[in-house]
């Protein structure tokens, strides 16, 4: 994990001496490179969850070193070694956001869904909500979720405990507090902890629907 960005980079392999893939490259790569050598892996692909710099910083280094095939657009499921990889379009945080389901039981969710939080709706709130509720959280509850930042979680845990999901499911009430974001009036539907220890907010603008934004952008009217 990157000490500043808190972003993750992953190495997934089928077995020692077998085949592996990288997922994102925004964290320090030395531990992953060391694992490739120690486990004598043949790495074939670089899976890119989205194009933001805190997830792509090491892409060129990895491509040059290993001659990797890069997966950064939707495509049919494919197999490399003993790994079967499904590419799930999950836009909302960014238009190009992808999640990757490996061997049917581990999903790399990028910046769409975190442990206890969700990504900012930088490109489309409707797409973000749909990607979470109709794609990621329809996977089996035991599916491991490895997000783009900080801690691992699971589909079942986020379905039951994620505060954004609970509001979307109608399990918890929406807030009524007034606030503003960038000078625009809004209602603060939800104020919740984010992956970095700060806050994230679901706001309903008076003039333009819902958005998920970083808490630092919200002026609360307490």
Where are the language model's segments positioned?
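Core dinuclear metal-dependent hydrolase active-site scaffold
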Residues: 11, 77-102, 107
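Conserved beta-strand hairpin/beta-sheet module of binuclear metal-dependent hydrolase folds
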Residues: 1-39, 99-110, 116
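Histidine-centered catalytic micro-motifs
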Residues: 46-56, 88-97, 145-152
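Accessory terminal helices/loops
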Residues: 130-144, 150-222
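A short acidic, helix-capping loop that chelates divalent metal ions and anchors anionic groups
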Residues: 115-122
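Active-site metal-binding motif and surrounding structural segment of the metallo-beta-lactamase
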Residues: 29-72
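Hydrophobic "anchor" residues on beta-strands that sit immediately upstream
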Residues: 20, 46, 84, 106-107, ...
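Divalent metal-coordination and catalytic microenvironments
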Residues: 12, 24, 50, 62, ...
């Amino acid at each position: 994990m990157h000490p500043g960005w808190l972003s993750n980079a992953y190495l997934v392999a089928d077995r020692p001496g077998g085949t592996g893939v990288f997922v994102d490259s925004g964290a320090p790569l030395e531990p992953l490179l060391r694992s490739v050598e120690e486990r004598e892996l043949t790495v074939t692909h670089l899976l890119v969850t989205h194009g933001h710099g805190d997830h792509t910083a090491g892409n060129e280094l990895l491509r040059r070193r290993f001659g990797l095939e890069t997966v950064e657009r939707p495509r049919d499921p494919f197999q490399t070694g003993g790994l079967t990889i499904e590419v799930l379009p999950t836009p909302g945080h960014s238009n190009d956001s992808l999640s990757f389901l490996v061997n049917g039981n581990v999903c790399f969710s990028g910046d769409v869904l975190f442990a206890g939080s969700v990504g900012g709706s930088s490109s489309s709130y409707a797409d973000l909500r749909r990607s979470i509720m109709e794609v990621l959280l329809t996977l089996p509850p035991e599916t491991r979720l490895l997000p783009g930042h900080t801690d691992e979680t699971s589909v079942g845990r986020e379905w039951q405990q994620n505060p954004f999901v609970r509001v979307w499911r109608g399990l918890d009430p929406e807030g009524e507090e007034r606030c503003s974001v960038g000078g625009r009036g809004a209602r603060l539907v939800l104020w919740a902890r984010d992956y970095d220890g700060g806050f994230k907010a679901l706001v309903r603008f008076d003039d333009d629907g819902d958005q998920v934004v970083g808490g630092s952008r919200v002026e609360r009217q307490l």
